[in-house]
Amino acid sequence: MPALWLRCGLCLALLLPAARASSGSQVCDCNGKSRQCIFDQELHKQTGNGFRCLNCNDNTDGIHCERCKAGFYRQRERDRCLPCNCNSKGSLSARCDNSGRCSCKPGVTGDRCDRCLPGFHTLTDAGCAQDQRLLDSKCDCDPAGISGPCDSGRCVCKPAVTGERCDRCRPGYYHLDGGNPQGCTQCFCYGHSASCHSSGDYSVHKIISAFHQDVDGWKAVQRNGSPAKLQWSQRHRDIFSSARRSDPVYFVAPAKFLGNQQVSYGQSLSFDYRVDRGGRHPSAHDVILEGAGLRITAPLMPLSKTLPCGITKTYTFRLNEHPSSNWSPQLSYFEYRRLLRNLTALRIRATYGEYSTGYIDNVTLISARPVSGAPAPWVEQCVCPVGYKGQFCQDCASGYKRDSARLGPFGTCIPCNCQGGGACDPDTGDCYSGDENPDIPECADCPIGFYNDPQDPRSCKPCPCRNGFSCSVMPETEEVVCNNCPQGVTGARCELCADGYFGDPFGERGPVRPCQPCQCNNNVDPSASGNCDRLTGRCLKCIHNTAGVHCDQCKAGYYGDPLAPNPADKCRACNCNPVGSEPVECRSDGSCVCKPGFGGLSCEHAALTSCPACYNQVKVQMDQFMQQLQILEALISKAQGGAVPNAELEGRMQQAEQALRDILREAQISQDAVRSFNLRVAKARTQENSYRDRLDDLKMTVERVRALGSQYQNQVQDTRRLITQMRLSLEESEASLQNTNIPPSEHYVGPNGFKSLAQEATRLADSHVQSASNMEQLAKETQEYSKELMSLVREALQEGGGSGSLDGAVVQRLVGKLQKTKSLAQELSREATQTDMEADRSYQHSLHLLNSVSQIQGVNDQSLQVEAKRLRQKADSLSNRVTKHMDEFKHVQSNLGNWEEETRQLLQNGKNGRQTSDQLLSRANLAKSRAQEALSMGNATFYEVENILKNLREFDLQVGDKRAEAEEAMKRLSYISQKVAGASDKTKQAEAALGSAAADAQRAKNAAREALEISGKIEQEIGGLNLEANVTADGALAMEKGLATLKSEMREVEGELSRKEQEFDMDMDAVQMVIAEAQRVENRAKNAGVTIQDTLNTLDGILHLIDQPGSVDEERLILLEQKLFRAKTQINSQLRPLMSELEERAHRQKGHLRFLETSIDGILADVKNLENIRDNLPPGCYNTQALEQQ
């Protein structure tokens, strides 16, 4: 009865406040995580709301289910709390932050604290440690062979790598390479051998197309294979192709990139590419390789990204079948090697969409060739089995033939089946006759299990092999050796077990036991030899810290699972303290056996007789709680016996509850303090990161300033070096001129007749040298004044930023420097003009010399006249170039005047404030660049004058050389005159004959032009029809997506692009006309030196062509009309049905949209209904029955 009264009293005490609160505004606030709550009087006193939530959902906790339970986290307030899953050994506690990251122990990393940091190993309850006693703890791994960090103290090797340090290739692989995802390359050997190594006879060879002179054999084709226009840029030294339509155009590689490219396996194919205009979305067929009936493709970049517009970027593709190389479809290893062995096509996409232009340059394929040079270790050298030979086992050995000739080197080699064991052709299998093999004696045809007796080849002897195995005789020792022993068996008589196997196949040491693989539980190195005893099978070279007959136990001082598949999970060091633990061993779970007086996970702590002083307060509090608990237990026992009044028991329980509340409140205060401290730490870290970013920005700014300064110094050094080279060239020219003997300008009077002319040329050369020195000095002074000008501008900026105006003295000084710079520029102009005048005088002297030579008595050689005319034209060209550069220099001089005006304007604006000072700095930089430009143009003018002087000197030498030829020509003058007269007659005849031929050619040309115009109109008509189809299709799509506005804008952009392209084409045509005109002039200059005999041959050829006049190609016109008819037929038969189908699809799509709208309306009505139900629910739900049962 008292117990019942207590329970009812508690229920009444809990329900009455709830009833009182129900009349106010207080309700259960559980953040949507609970439907149950209870009233707490103390909580009501503290917060004014006494409802405490019960049974919080979604792993939440707290008075209002406002936080996650210990060991759970969430990123946002309303999210479900997710488990932290912190590793119990590697984390400091089960808690984690809002992103799910746990707090790790020393040496541990990872979001879950489940991995060791690099250089650490053995994750235990104390964290990860580095055991100095173990050699493996150094993690001395070969970086080319590892696939991840060394967490367990042992190197984690790539799939094709082995060894304790991951420094060796597995059997069947070779060439350890850090760039290979597998680590090593699988032996190819055409599938005939699994043993190979890197060849030392090959060196690196790069197959390159850099397009320095022409297209280098490359072509451009449409997707259907039809040819497209490919152009070479002389300026940029690259090739490009354009497309007006959306069909892609591809660059096609020449023959040097095709054929047998086996030695390029695993290497890279790279090229520089950029696209201008058009679409810029990559496709799966951007790069295409074809060969041996196979075809693979790859995109330039991930399909989710966009190609950069107008930016040249290098794209690299690795030639292997690994998924990271992005080739599709993914071939097998041998399929990829078969493709490279007979590569028939390499295509790279050029255009993307309409009006697109693609540029490509520096196409490079890494290959190898058998010459000396940088080694190419990726080329293999195979160890061929019996019946094969060659570096790659690609040939059949003597006495063997192809099982299938159509497979080529991939086919299997089998023994020849010839009478008497004769040899045969390795490809066809045809047996050689006896006279073709005189060294092979006639032998008996022995069956399997027998061999020819070396002493008597006509007789057969049984093989000394059991089970009827075949055998052969070694030619060197005549020893009989058994062939084709079964797997796992070896020896001359197949009497031994092979490496990695054990047993006794003949029972020579006991009962017969067939050879079987050693059972070492994957705890031996498969690339090592002698892993087990060949007779007993006992494992001899256990690794991973294992031991035992079958490597199935951990070594002393280690624990774990020796049969685990992951090496990191196998046997690990016990890590016991040698002082506090029993002999260095541990239990199966890694726990150490401690000596008396020691404790801890590794027995590293000595036992303590009492707790530290910092625990005294806690101990006192715990003792008080224990006393109260004992009193409560006594009261409860008495209450059950009926000897203690319930009021006393109730009071004691309230005291206990109060004590518990105090503890909870103190814990909450501590938790709040920790949370506040964490927020302060986070804020400090944020500020630290901000400061670090600002510091990095400052460092980058300093580096950029240093780089600009270094670049400027390099430019100054280059200018000085060029001036020095020009001075040396002038000195060398002067020395050459002094050592040159020049013939006389008048009639020939002797070897010293041109002495005065040589002295005049020497004087001119000296004056040129002096002019160059003056120009150099003026250029240096201009550069120094430019530097001073920049420093003054910077001072003006600094003063303007501080006081808002410039000092008057600084302004005056700046103007003075400007005037002095202007005067130096004018003086530089005068020097250049004087140099031009001297060069012109030299030119006039040369013309006078030419006229004098042409007046030599008795000389009338036409070839000499032609040569003199060519040299005169060359001199005129050089003079024109000098005039042109003088005009450019005057233009630069006029720019200097503009610079003066702009600088004065900058000075005036600098007085108005800081913003105007910034403008002054920018324009001063512009002035500096123009001054440098003037200096470079002056240097260029000096360079041109030097070349003119050099050419004039060469001209004098050439005239002297022609003197001997002129004397020889005088002897042949009469004969040449006769030939010239005959040639003149024939020329007149040819001109008469050419009159009618020219008219016929003009008519043929007009007819061809009309045919081209007709074909152009046909193409325009077809394009118009296609455009109408596209407009119809776009109209159908516009009905669904509402893209009419975007479409019009795109048309405007396309029109603008078309106009730009037309302007570009016009510019290109003008450039081509200039180039063609220059080419024609050059050709005429070259043809001037052709002999009379060549002229006669040309006339004979012209007369022969006149006898075979051309005609208009009417068949081409008929063919064009037929194509037009077929195009119209195709439009009526295919395009119109397609338009109807698109209209039908649009109609169906509209119906589907109407159905979706109806469904959405229904769903919205259901949602509205649910909201009404939610609004009518009561604010709280109180389970009084559940309270009664507590």
UniProtKB/Swiss-Prot annotation:
Domain of life per record: Eukaryota
N-terminal signal peptide: 1-21
Assigned keywords, A-Z: Basement membrane, Cell adhesion, Coiled coil, Disulfide bond, Extracellular matrix, Glycoprotein, Heparin-binding, Laminin EGF-like domain, Proteoglycan, Repeat, Secreted, Signal
Keyword Repeat: yes
Recorded GO CC terms: basement membrane; extracellular region
Annotated Laminin EGF-like domain residues: 28-83, 84-130, 139-186, 187-196, 382-415, 416-462, 463-517, 518-573, 574-603
Glycosylation sites: N342, N362, S803, N939, N1030
Single GO biological process annotation from the record: tissue development
Sequence segments annotated as region (Domain II and I): 604-1190
Coiled coil: 613-718, 809-1073, 1114-1190
Keyword Nuclease among record annotations: no
Domain Laminin IV type A stretches: 213-381
A Pfam family recorded for this sequence: EGF_laminin
Any one GO molecular-function label of the UniProt entry: heparin binding
Disulphide connectivity of cysteines: C28-C37, C30-C53, C56-C65, C68-C81, C84-C96, C86-C102, C104-C113, C116-C128, C139-C150, C141-C155, C157-C166, C169-C184, C463-C471, C465-C482, C485-C494, C497-C515, C518-C532, C520-C539, C542-C551, C554-C571, C574-C586, C576-C592, C594-C603
Post-translational modifications: O-glycosylated; contains chondroitin sulfate (CS).
Function as written in the Swiss-Prot or TrEMBL entry: Binding to cells via a high affinity receptor, laminin is thought to mediate the attachment, migration and organization of cells into tissues during embryonic development by interacting with other extracellular matrix components. Ladsin exerts cell-scattering activity toward a wide variety of cells, including epithelial, endothelial, and fibroblastic cells.
Note: Binds heparin.
Oligomeric and partner information: Laminin is a complex glycoprotein, consisting of three different polypeptide chains (alpha, beta, gamma), which are bound to each other by disulfide bonds into a cross-shaped molecule comprising one long and three short arms with globules at each end. Gamma-2 is a subunit of laminin-5 (laminin-332 or epiligrin/kalinin/nicein).
Description of its domains: The alpha-helical domains I and II are thought to interact with other laminin chains to form a coiled coil structure. Domain IV is globular.
Protein name per the record: Laminin subunit gamma-2
Organism: Equus caballus (Horse)
Gene of this entry: LAMC2
